[in-house]
Amino acid sequence: MFAFAGGFSYLCVNVTGMKIYLLGPAHPFRGGIATIMETMAREFVRRGNDVRILTFTVQYPEMLFPGKSQYVTTPPPADISIERAVSTVNPFNWQRVGLRLRRERPDMVLMKYWTPFMAPCFGSIARLARGNGVTKVLCQIDNVEPHEHHIVDRPFNRWYLGAVDGFVYMSEQVHGELKGYTSAPMLFSPHPMFENFGSRVDRAEACRRIGVDPSFSYTLFFGLIRDYKGLDMLLRAWSRWRPSGRRLIVAGEFYASREKYLDIISREGLAADVVLRDRFIPDDEVRYYFSAADALVLPYRTATQSGVPQIAYNFSLPMIVTDVGGLSEIVRDGRAGVVCPPTVEGIEDALRRMYERGMMDVVRKNIAAERERFSWGAMCDRIEEVYAMTKV
């Protein structure tokens, strides 16, 4: 059945009883992408499907991984099936997994794609799996062109993206890039809201848990620290603004030069104004950071989309984001936050708009309604629609 609204058509489907394999990060691998895979698996199970996640035996070789650990130490989830089966660096493994999928004939193989590093592995598996005349390979895609470019990106992307039957993308920038590689069916669905971090806690308790002085107010920068995320611009904007009674919490593990940012903090005289928690923040601590702060800042230089705003939505936390990639599609100005140019001056002005010109009160009134746009059910609906649009 087709429904028409505002010039767009949507294929309404209700697909149950399918055999679905998800391929991507999941327990014991850490991070937001693993959370996405596990949450999508739960939603497809809830809909009456037979679901299994095939995650990695090797995700990244240790010498290529910039963080301290790729793994969590918590027990595996008991409500979904996760099997460690895929090595991204072993072509013989790709053949084994691809032939296994061809033999087991799942209705759908749903892959999570966020970096061309995965392309040789994923593309090889996809091409073998599709050879049974039954299995459709779909992709829920974060990025096409990576934030840090390499000469192999385009050929790797061509190898993988050309092996996929259909896509669900999360920003118009990715949509435009994707069309340069494939004419396969593709639909938009925004990044769903993360709901696995619990609910907001009392601010004083949150401050106690993360070891900060509750007599100060806090603004939060959260997530892995890479150069494209613009923390240096935020620090310089903070130095220009110099608010009284407010500190900036920087919470996340450095995937870039730590010394570069410490040097900025020192040169700008921000040692007393910045609370640095430079480590990976485990899931059970996330809510304390988002409960201690009254706003989140994403000062990115470039982006396609980001999962961090979806954590903020879970806690109804107002946001300041730069107008790059798909961020302004997710965080609408005056609704969930303030959107600004990706410059030091633009970020400083956005901080002043939020805290000195009344925008905080406006956003707090509107953000609850904005949350309704970001459900996991909607994401899985789009995946099922793309499945129905594809041909074996």
Range-by-range predicted roles:
Residues 26-30, 42-103, 174, 179, ...:
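N-terminal strand-loop element at the rim of the active site
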Residues 212-229, 235-238, 248-250:
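Conserved donor-binding/catalytic core segment of Leloir-type glycosyltransferases
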Residues 259-284:
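Nucleotide-activated donor-binding/catalytic signature segment of Leloir-type glycosyltransferases, i.e.
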Residues 288-304, 317:
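Acidic donor-binding loop of glycosyltransferase active sites
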Residues 333-345, 351-359:
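Conserved acidic donor-binding segment of nucleotide-sugar-dependent glycosyltransferases
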